[in-house]
């Protein structure tokens, strides 16, 4: 964004956006902006959701955290009905990996959630881990077609938070803890994957762990 502290101009590696936010910046650059949210933050009937969805030309709130199939159908319809020559900015908030860790066709019941704030009889770190991993694997299969359409574009996959599964007596998120602040980040810039390089601190952490077994 303009005045964000990055002084470079448009180049082969970057370009500058101007606007109230990133989505507005892409719209001003001529992009078709398409977005879909699953978690309640994006509920367009709320004040917060209306603010988050307003910058998009097209936006769909799924209504719950287990509607990825509907979201992908809606996005595909938007892509088919817009000018294929116009660049697209697509935002997708996936809910299945969010509590209660459930996806369409899952072999377990949606409720009770294995992870709730402050704990409870239904809480289980083992179930939380296995169900979230299963949801992630299912999501991978569903996203394949959409990602393939943008394989030569810039793609960013991340999470807004992690979850606590009993660490230090804590559960779920909405709290400051290393488990909630650790998130995945995968990037492909203009078709090329970004490979991370180990930092000195990470290298020392690996060495310290190895020493425990020597």
Role assignments for model-derived ranges:
Residues 1-214:
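Catalytic domains that recognize anionic headgroups
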């Amino acid at each position: 964004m303009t005045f964000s502290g990055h002084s470079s101009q448009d180049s082969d590696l970057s370009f500058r956006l101007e606007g109230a936010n990133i989505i507005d910046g892409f719209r001003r650059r001529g992009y078709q902006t398409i977005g879909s949210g699953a978690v309640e933050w994006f509920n367009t009937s709320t004040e917060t959701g209306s603010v988050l969805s307003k910058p998009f030309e097209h936006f769909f709130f799924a209504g719950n955290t287990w509607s990825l199939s509907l979201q992908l159908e809606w996005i595909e319809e938007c892509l088919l009905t817009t000018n294929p020559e116009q660049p697209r900015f697509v935002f997708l908030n996936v809910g299945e990996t969010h509590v209660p860790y459930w996806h369409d066709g899952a072999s377990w019941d949606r409720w009770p959630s294995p992870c709730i704030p402050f704990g409870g009889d239904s809480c289980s770190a083992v179930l939380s881990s296995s169900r979230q991993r299963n949801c992630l694997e299912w999501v991978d299969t569903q996203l394949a077609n959409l990602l393939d359409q943008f394989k030569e574009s810039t793609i960013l996959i991340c999470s807004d938070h992690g979850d606590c599964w009993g660490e230090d007596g804590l559960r779920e998120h909405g709290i400051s803890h290393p488990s909630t602040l650790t998130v995945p980040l995968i990037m492909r810039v203009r078709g090329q994957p970004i490979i991370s390089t180990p930092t000195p601190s990470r290298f020392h952490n690996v060495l310290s762990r190895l020493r425990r077994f020597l």
